[in-house]
């Protein structure tokens, strides 16, 4: 087993890889110097399986070590997105994912578009949706309000909606995922990790694979 880390940072003087056992607190268990490679990249090969570990990159420039970063290409992170995570991607795909296909669209003029915010869509106490404010709310069917009216996806189908435009789903900065009970709100236009789903919409922001 081998783990390979690569970072493009052509202006760096040195780069180190910080390895952690936690996605949130604690000092690094290891700090490893990376080697300069081709085309402005830095790389390190570690001869063991690091699944379950967390990591950051840290750049030295002009004698000063800059703040740690998970890297802009991180696809899995710990709580609040400060540390990237090493995961097994085979564990993230739901059943049937590889064979899933979108419906055929014959004419763009057939589109009836609905803009949707993950939290707003389901957070109302009377939505009848179990996973209020979460990604999973978009998987629930058969939900109803106390008055018996359809809610969630069923309501959109009744409206004749064919396509949903979802507001930012990526990991954004202003919601503290440790304090979701504070009910803080944001549309999501303050990106932190572009390639990671936001933890506040996950049922477990601590576990990297849960939000994916």
Task: Explain the meaning of each model-derived region.
Residues 3-6:
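Structural beta-strand segments of beta-rich domains
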Residues 127-144, 176-212:
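Aromatic- and acidic-residue-enriched carbohydrate-binding clefts of CAZyme catalytic domains
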Residues 118-120, 124-125, 131-149, 154-165, ...:
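Phosphate-binding active sites in nucleotide-utilizing proteins
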Residues 18, 119, 167, 197:
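Conserved residues at the C-terminal ends of beta-strands
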Residues 16-18, 58:
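Beta-strand signatures of extracellular beta-sandwich domains
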Residues 8-15, 50:
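Short proline/glycine-enriched turn/loop motifs at strand-loop junctions of beta-rich domains
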Residues 156-183:
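Carboxylate/His-rich catalytic cores and anion/metal-binding grooves
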